[in-house]
Amino acid sequence: MKNPSEILVKQVTVIDPNSPFNKKKVDVLISNGTISEISTKIESEDNMKIVEIDKGYVCPGLFDFSTDFQEPGNEQKETIKSGIEAAINGGFTGVGLQPTLSPARDTLSEISYCKEKSNGNPLEIIPYGTISKNGDGEELSEMYDMYTAGALAFTDHLKPVQHAGLMSRALLYAKNFNGLVISNPYDQSISPTGQMHEGITSTAMGLNGIPSLAEELHINRDISITKYNEGKIHFNIISSKESVLRIADSKNDNLNVSCGTSIYHLIFNDEHLQNFAADFKMLPPLRTKEDQIALIEGIKKGVVDVITSNHQPHENEIREVEFPIAPMGCIGTQIAFPMALTYLLDELDLETIVKTMSINPRTILQTDIPVIKEGFVANLTL
């Protein structure tokens, strides 16, 4: 008699480059949360839960590298609980949680609070800590203490570190415990009041623009600092063609550099804001069609490692206002993977999408990578 906790997934095609069953159509038997058998055909029994999906696929559980669940401080936008539900509904089994909240997540106790709030949920949450105390960009936070509590990465997120000396100290300090420093590349001094990408569209709309230069200067600075300190850095979301080229050069120089972009930057561009659509207002801004194409090519060539949702929810009443006063950011974790499957398969194969939305994020964070193989935990997305 089979255990009632068994789940039999019928006739799905495996998409997992680390699995011996990659691109094969199989049945997968899950027993007590572990993959117990994979075969071309497994006989079902009455007390098994049977899962059948027409033309279905199974891949390692997706991981959303950049999400903001807004708790504590902005629970009216979203809570950890509702964020978990959104991520699971989007097919994710893990997320990286951004720290720039009110209060900033800059101490061991804040990391512990986040971990405790997520206990007992099927979603793996890796909270990021801030680089600086209070996220104010002036003094290093308690990075190692936060690391011991479960923070694997550090970033000031929406308040990018403007002080080169602080970034240098962060990269140097993180080397002591193999922590990851994440940069959101934006030199705010270039265009502190920008609303969207600076170009033909912003001029036609009469809006202050954010030039690609603001991103590219910051990337050049942080790559130089990383090289000097022999450190490790990840650029969270890049948006321009020149950024792709600069990071490609750094990888060719064997620097420990990785980067990601958002699903929105791969599918849309600044022309989609022509009707003042606040849903497309984000940081970094959507840039030109040429930049959009360069990002896709960057993924194909392995320069861009991660596709993230860049999930930043806001309540409707502050979104449905005039474009200049609408906040940056929008929802994403519940729709990022469906968007990728709908809009990107003409450019990227499914295995590449899985790598950038499951395997690569976990590799960069140095956390366990799910594998579709007998004896491994059933951390899967169907």
Where are the predicted features?
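Active-site metal-binding motif and surrounding structural segment of the metallo-beta-lactamase
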Residues: 42-58
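Histidine/acidic residue-rich metal-binding segments in metalloenzymes
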Residues: 141-307
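N-terminal metal-binding scaffold of metallo-dependent hydrolase/deaminase domains
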Residues: 1-45
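His/Asp/Glu-enriched, well-ordered alpha-helical/loop segment
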Residues: 204-230, 301, 306-307, 312-382
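Metal-associated gating/positioning segment near the N- to mid-region
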Residues: 54-118
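Active-site mouth loops of central-metabolism enzymes
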Residues: 65-78, 126-139, 208-212
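Divalent metal-coordination and catalytic microenvironments
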Residues: 12, 33, 55, 66, ...
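Alpha-helix-loop-beta-strand connector modules within alpha/beta enzyme cores
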Residues: 108-124, 172-183, 335, 339
